[in-house]
């Protein structure tokens, strides 16, 4: 894999990865009635992610890439399932509430990760991180209080579930650091594909939606894969603190694209979402400053 050792080159690459991911909510909003074909979306997106990541691994490592599957172990399977649940929850969240709610729930992932690592890996949480978690929790509660409609509450719950699923993936990587990251994500794609296949058969539905929707499903999967590859290249040269801040590109961009009248969606966040989001951004910024002081580095290998 291409490795960047200079901070100056790594930052724009990670920013571009976040920019690619930020178009995900816009792609979903352009779909025709995605709430009526969630399993077809999960089927198409999961299959796209599985195929593209295996192709990338093949070109990166040659035919021996399949040996990565022998190395995943329990951590890889658990992480893949956690990530798969996150992907499934994402579509149910964003089709039942605003993109802002879904994305801000995902922005709380570092704090769920810290709590899970504390519970299962016995990682110590400092007082400053607890402060960040409390501030983030206040923001999440404020957003939850603004979701009074039944469908919006369901979307919020699925958004939190998606964030926890991503956190499970992150914690499993800490649990066993030699777990192949890309292979674990490919397993998540396969998990989505298998679960969606099962649900489609039970519901006696077609596997594919309209040609337009199917292309949107694959486009979203492609954006996820390309962003992941670029993120993995740039993340090796960037401290975790800066990565946390740079990851906000996805959140800010995702909210901005669905609001921008140019794209025809014009989805405006509610007051509670804006206030709760402000608390989340404050907590993430504070958390990033703490991480910077600790000089911690993370990366996808």
Residue ranges and their predicted role:
Residues 53, 116, 125-145, 164, ...:
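Hydrophobic transmembrane alpha-helices of multi-pass small-molecule transport proteins
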Residues 3-4, 46, 145, 248-301:
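C-terminal-most transmembrane helix of multi-pass membrane proteins
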Residues 22, 26, 80, 84-88, ...:
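Hydrophobic/small/kink-forming positions within alpha-helical transmembrane segments
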Residues 2-4, 49-70, 136-151, 191-213, ...:
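Membrane-interface helix-cap regions at the ends of transmembrane helices
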Residues 34-85, 112, 165-169, 186-203, ...:
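Transmembrane alpha-helices of multi-pass small-molecule transport proteins
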Residues 9-17, 57, 64-89, 128, ...:
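Loop-to-transmembrane-helix transition segments
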Residues 18, 44, 102-108, 173-192, ...:
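Helix-helix packing/entry segments at the starts of transmembrane helices
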């Amino acid at each position: 894999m291409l490795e960047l050792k200079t901070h100056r080159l790594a930052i724009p690459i990670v920013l571009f990865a976040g920019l690619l991911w930020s178009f995900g909510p816009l792609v979903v909003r352009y779909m025709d009635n995605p709430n009526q074909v969630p399993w077809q979306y999960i089927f198409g997106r999961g299959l796209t992610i599985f195929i593209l990541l295996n192709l990338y691994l093949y070109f990166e490592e040659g035919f021996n890439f399949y040996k990565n599957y022998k190395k995943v172990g329990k951590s890889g399977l658990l992480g893949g399932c956690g990530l798969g649940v996150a992907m499934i929850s994402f579509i149910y969240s964003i089709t039942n509430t605003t993109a802002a709610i879904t994305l801000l729930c995902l922005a709380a992932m570092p704090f769920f990760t810290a709590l899970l690592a504390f519970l299962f890996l016995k990682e110590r949480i400092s007082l400053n991180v607890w402060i960040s978690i409390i501030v983030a929790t206040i923001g999440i509660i404020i957003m939850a209080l603004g979701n009074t409609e039944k469908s919006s509450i369901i979307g919020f719950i699925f958004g939190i579930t998606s964030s926890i699923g991503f956190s499970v993936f992150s914690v499993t990587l800490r649990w066993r650091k030699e777990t192949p990251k890309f292979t674990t994500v490919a397993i998540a794609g396969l998990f989505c594909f298998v679960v969606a296949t099962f649900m489609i058969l039970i519901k006696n539905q077609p596997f594919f939606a309209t040609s337009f929707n199917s292309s949107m499903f694959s486009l979203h999967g492609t954006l996820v894969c390309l962003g992941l590859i670029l993120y993995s290249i740039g993340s090796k040269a960037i401290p975790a603190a800066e990565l946390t801040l740079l990851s906000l590109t996805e959140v800010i961009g995702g909210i901005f694209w669905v609001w921008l009248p140019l794209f025809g969606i014009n989805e405006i966040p509610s007051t509670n979402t804006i206030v709760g989001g402000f608390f989340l951004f404050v907590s993430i910024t504070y958390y990033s400053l703490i991480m910077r002081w600790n000089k911690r580095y993370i990366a996808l290998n």
